[in-house]
Amino acid sequence: RIVVVKSNNISIDINEIKQLKNYEYFLANLSSIINKIFEEQKEYICCANGCCGCCSQGMYPYSELEFKYLKLGFDNLPSEIKKLVINNIKEINQQYKGKDFMHKCPFLINGSCSVYLYRGIICRTFGLITENSQGKLTIPFCAKEGLNYSQVYNKETERISEEDVKKLGYKVMPQAYNLSRQHIETLSFAKELGLNWGESKMLLEWLLPYIE
């Protein structure tokens, strides 16, 4: 899938190409795992084409490696779509409110991700109940909007109702998964590939130099 495009904004050397190819292989393995998880939780999942709530309000943390791969996707977009993305970045930047600023992803065009195959880890894992290394659970915000897990989500307690799970006859219990990038980076196949993730920033921070 990797297509190297020369541009004024980024130059890719042999080592970077190797890293990006390894990252692409990593994504194939990761997707296999995530797809199985979504399949296990399919009774509670409402994700479908045209559903873009997760792309409409977020901060989108990206490692440097993830961003470089995303940038390849951007470089291969038709010129008219590139212009729309750049306009989105400029518009979001004008609205920027500092740390913890929630915004629409600039790559969301007409309700669809314009760089879907190149999207980051946060985009691939959203929609599931997650658990960090300290055991803290996070239920996807779309549960409050009548989507994933909403059938068994108690808005008053902000928790999953085991009573509703049983009462409604679900076959499996909702499960939480540690899908943080920090955890994913430690998976055996990730370590074996020797990926250099680089620093982590919010997506908007990575993108701003390209409109200056």
Predicted regions and their residues:
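Short loop/turn segments that flank or connect secondary-structure elements
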Residues: R1-G53, Q57-G58, Y62-E212
